[in-house]
């Protein structure tokens, strides 16, 4: 299916690009989330009329994400979990736990924005975690997992 992107989509294209994607991806994700429209003649003409407005909105989102990214970048956060004497956690610290930790610290972050390269944290100690605030703004934070010996 041919679609026109209404915002930047990772691994697909930028605002205004006309791309071909699988029908299911367009119908089930891009179009319902208002990230794209079908590339009909009418939709392309309407997009060209609204292009400046959409570019302004995209620039505002990027600027807001960069401002939050500057505050968040390099910060360290602590979380306590029950652990054994060998340093292994009972359970793990997931991206949802890190998102809750960041929300309590005053940052609006969803769990889908938290990226953990090695998967959930299962050991005590300091771990590097990435937070994707925007497709162009990814910041590194440190999560210090403190063991609460049971």
UniProtKB/Swiss-Prot annotation:
GO BP annotations, alphabetical order: translation
One term under GO cellular component: ribonucleoprotein complex
Database matches in InterPro entries: Ribosomal_bL9, Ribosomal_bL9/RNase_H1_N, Ribosomal_bL9_bac/chp, Ribosomal_bL9_C, Ribosomal_bL9_C_sf, Ribosomal_bL9_N, Ribosomal_bL9_N_sf
Pfam families linked: Ribosomal_L9_C (PF03948), Ribosomal_L9_N (PF01281)
Keywords assigned: Ribonucleoprotein, Ribosomal protein, RNA-binding, rRNA-binding
Molecular functions per Gene Ontology: rRNA binding; structural constituent of ribosome
Family per record: Belongs to the bacterial ribosomal protein bL9 family.
Role description: Binds to the 23S rRNA.
Protein name from the UniProt record: Large ribosomal subunit protein bL9
Gene from which the chain derives: rplI
């Amino acid at each position: 299916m041919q679609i026109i992107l209404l915002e930047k989509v990772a691994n697909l294209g930028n605002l205004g690009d006309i791309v071909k994607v699988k029908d299911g991806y367009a119908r089930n994700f891009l179009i319902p989330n208002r990230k794209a429209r079908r590339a009909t003649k009418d939709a392309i003409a309407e997009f060209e009329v609204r292009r400046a407005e959409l570019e302004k909105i995209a620039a505002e989102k990027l600027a807001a994400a960069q401002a939050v990214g500057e505050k968040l970048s390099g910060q360290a956060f602590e979380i306590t979990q029950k652990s054994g004497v060998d340093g292994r956690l009972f359970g793990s610290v997931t991206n949802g736990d890190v998102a809750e930790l960041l929300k309590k610290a005053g940052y609006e972050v969803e769990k889908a924005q938290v990226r953990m390269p090695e998967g959930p944290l299962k050991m005590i100690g300091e771990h590097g975690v990435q937070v994707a605030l925007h497709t162009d703004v990814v910041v590194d934070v440190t999560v210090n997992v403190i063991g609460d010996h049971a």
